[in-house]
């Protein structure tokens, strides 16, 4: 997977300074209205896969109403927003049309066109909006799912699905730019590590400077500084646990390949046949839970090999939580067995 070079928050902000996620700012890039000959204008780079809607053009032409100014790229004279209005104006026989020029780049112009067709005029189809979002993902991979969703009329969840399905062709960035224009690291541990290095290299730097360079909030930079002053790791305990390398966990999976799970399988089979367990509601519930976790080693290898990369940390955390619960169950049962044995010993003495 190809990564973008120069992905520091500062560089990302420079690359997308004009489109920092607050898509509404693009509207400020429009010139005053001017009249332009209709024959001087070229068709748009339209997000509509089906092209123009002839019936909609006829409706606009027949309405007789004054149509809003269209938006045009000044350098190429291509229409960014308003092809239906341009066709309707020609159908009316007019030779000039009201135009506002867009002062921005080609990528910004496409995003403006998509957003314009989402918020007014003839709506884009769902397929067109998805195609537009995929294109924005390619040109602005550092934008957050919410920011792209705002521009294309899709939910953040849908954009996230498109991102995960198109990662092979989409350059990857280690930050996301939100709707507020702020760059945030995808992995907060990296931001904390960078803040730690910057603080050690330049102890006199202000927290705002450190936060801006590391792509973290000032409060996070402050927390890192406090941790360093106490001689602690810049990472909270929960993040340090997630950092355990996968290779360190591999032997635990491999060790089951020698059939060490077999005795547990036999024990579970005998337990399932025990009437005192299987003939009670609580016993059957316990058997269901035990059967869920009694997965063979080869099944684990298959399941773990198909976990989506973006779900690894979440599933690992859930697995640790389940392991903690079962560990506590085992300890309580062990203690119950000890207490019962002690009770029998006392009764024997008595």
UniProtKB/Swiss-Prot annotation:
The keyword Kinase does not apply. Residues 177-189, 223-242 have a biased composition (Basic and acidic residues). InterPro entries: ParB/Sulfiredoxin_dom (IPR003115), ParB/Sulfiredoxin_sf (IPR036086), WH-like_DNA-bd_sf (IPR036388). Residues 1-10 have a biased composition (Polar residues). The lineage of its organism: Bacteria, Bacillati, Actinomycetota, Actinomycetes, Kitasatosporales. SUPFAM superfamilies: ParB/Sulfiredoxin. This is Streptomycin biosynthesis operon possible regulatory protein. GO terms for biological process: streptomycin biosynthetic process. The keyword Metal-binding does not apply. It comes from the Bacteria. Keywords: Antibiotic biosynthesis, Streptomycin biosynthesis, Transcription, Transcription regulation. It holds the Pfam family ParBc. Residues 1-20, 168-189, 211-258 are annotated as: Disordered.
């Amino acid at each position: 997977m190809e990564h973008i070079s120069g992905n520091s928050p500062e560089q990302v902000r420079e690359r997308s300074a004009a489109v920092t996620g607050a898509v509404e700012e693009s509207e400020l890039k429009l010139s005053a209205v001017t009249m332009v000959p209709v024959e001087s204008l070229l068709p748009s780079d339209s997000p509509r896969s089906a092209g123009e809607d002839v019936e909609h053009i006829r409706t606009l032409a027949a309405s007789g109403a004054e149509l809003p100014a269209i938006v045009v790229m000044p350098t190429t004279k291509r229409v960014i927003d308003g092809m239906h209005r341009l066709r309707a104006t020609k159908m009316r026989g007019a030779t000039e049309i009201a135009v506002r020029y867009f002062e921005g780049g080609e990528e910004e112009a496409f995003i403006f066109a998509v957003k314009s067709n989402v918020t007014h005029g003839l709506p884009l189809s769902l397929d067109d909006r998805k195609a537009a979002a995929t294109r924005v993902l390619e040109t602005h991979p550092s934008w957050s799912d919410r920011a792209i969703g705002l521009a294309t009329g899709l939910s953040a969840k849908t954009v996230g699905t498109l991102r995960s399905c198109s990662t092979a062709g989409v350059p990857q960035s280690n930050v996301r730019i939100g709707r507020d224009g702020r760059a945030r690291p995808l992995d907060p541990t990296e931001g904390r590590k960078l803040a730690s290095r910057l603080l050690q290299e330049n102890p006199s730097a202000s927290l705002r400077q450190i936060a801006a360079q590391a792509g973290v909030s000032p409060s996070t930079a402050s927390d890192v500084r406090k941790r360093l002053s106490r001689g602690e790791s810049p990472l909270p305990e929960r993040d340090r646990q997630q950092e355990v390398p996968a290779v360190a966990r591999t032997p635990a999976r491999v060790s089951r390949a020698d059939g060490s799970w077999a005795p547990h399988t036999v024990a579970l089979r005998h337990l399932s046949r025990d009437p005192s367990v299987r003939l009670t509601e609580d016993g059957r519930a316990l058997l269901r839970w035990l059967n869920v976790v009694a997965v063979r080693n080869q099944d684990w290898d298959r399941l773990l090999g198909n976990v989506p990369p973006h779900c690894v940390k979440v599933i690992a955390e859930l697995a640790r939580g389940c392991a903690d619960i079962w560990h506590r169950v085992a300890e309580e049962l062990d203690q119950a067995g000890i207490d019962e044995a002690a009770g029998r010993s006392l009764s024997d003495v008595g």
